[in-house]
Curated annotation (Swiss-Prot):
Annotated active site: H48
UniProt protein name: 3-hydroxyacyl-[acyl-carrier-protein] dehydratase FabZ
InterPro entries: FabA_FabZ, FabZ, HotDog_dom_sf
Subcellular location(s) per record: Cytoplasm
GO biological-process terms attached to the record: fatty acid biosynthetic process; lipid A biosynthetic process
Function of the molecule: Involved in unsaturated fatty acids biosynthesis. Catalyzes the dehydration of short chain beta-hydroxyacyl-ACPs and long chain saturated and unsaturated beta-hydroxyacyl-ACPs.
A Pfam family it matches: FabA
Cellular component terms per the entry's GO annotation: cytoplasm; membrane
Catalyzed reactions: a (3R)-hydroxyacyl-[ACP] = a (2E)-enoyl-[ACP] + H2O
Name of the coding gene: fabZ
Length: 145
């Protein structure tokens, strides 16, 4: 398990754009499970949408990418990562299946499809109550800062 303090050591993101709260399972080079507790107090709900708050799809995909970044970092053991960052490269096959609302616990599950050098190809799902809310394939690359 990886708590928020360790996530902050890995990812450069900070409030209001840090979109994972905890990693609950990590199999380096294989998969990750992480979650975000979606609360009504998030700034995004002031405008998306007043009276009918829905967590934006782009934020779901970004949270998925952040979980993938943690997976890539924790899977890379053969080099010093202190001056490295993971950049999100592509989104493919993104689908949104159900809305995410305040009070939902959004769980990210990502599996490595391919890894070559510094490039990672991942298949991700975002779930609420074990039901798929969104899915996508992502590519990321570990780069120098």
């Amino acid at each position: 398990m990886i708590d928020i303090n360790e996530i902050l050591e890995i990812l450069p993101h900070r409030f209001p754009f840090l979109l994972i709260d905890r990693v609950i399972d990590l199999q380096p080079g294989i998969s990750i499970k992480a979650y975000k507790n979606v609360t009504f107090n998030e700034q995004i709900f002031q405008g998306h949408f007043p009276g009918h708050p829905i967590y934006p799809g782009v934020m779901i995909i970004e949270g998925m990418a952040q979980a993938g970044g943690v997976l890539a970092f924790k899977s890379t053991t053969d080099e010093d990562l202190s001056n490295k960052v993971v950049y999100f490269m592509t989104i493919d096959k993104a689908k949104f299946r159900q809305p995410i609302r305040p009070g939902d616990r959004l769980e990210y599950r990502l599996n490595v499809l391919k890894h070559r050098g510094r490039i990672w190809v991942l298949k991700g799902e975002a779930l609420v109550d074990d039901k798929v809310a969104a899915e996508a394939e992502l590519q990321a690359m570990i780069m120098d800062k």
